[in-house]
Amino acid sequence: MARKSIIARNERRKELVEKYAAKREELKKAGDYEALRKLPRDSSATRVRNRCVLTGRGRGNYEKFGLCRNMFRKLALEGKLPGVRKASW
C-alpha cells in the first residue's frame, strides 16, 4: 500500500486542479503564459496520478474501475464487480 502522505498529496493536487481549472483554461486561450506560470505548480492536471481507491497503488490501474490490477483481479474472482467475469473460450 502506498504511504498515506503520498495519497494525501495526490488528493490535494486534485483539489487544486479543480479550483484552478477555469482560470487555467482562460489563460491558455488568451495566450498569457506569464500569468499561467505564476499559478501553483500542482494546479496542472498532468501532476495528478491515477491511484487505486483501495490501496493507493500508482501503477497498473484500470481507470474505468478506479482499481489497480491486483485488487481488480481479487474482487472480480470474488464476484464483487458487477458484470465482470473470467474469460473462457
From Swiss-Prot:
Keywords: Ribonucleoprotein, Ribosomal protein, RNA-binding, rRNA-binding. GO terms for molecular function: rRNA binding; structural constituent of ribosome. Belongs to the universal ribosomal protein uS14 family. One of its GO terms (biological process) is translation. Binds 16S rRNA, required for the assembly of 30S particles and may also be responsible for determining the conformation of the 16S rRNA at the A site. The keyword Ribonucleoprotein applies. The keyword Ribosomal protein applies. SUPFAM superfamilies: Glucocorticoid receptor-like (DNA-binding domain). This is Small ribosomal subunit protein uS14. Part of the 30S ribosomal subunit. Contacts proteins S3 and S10. One of its GO terms (cellular component) is cytoplasm. PROSITE patterns: RIBOSOMAL_S14.
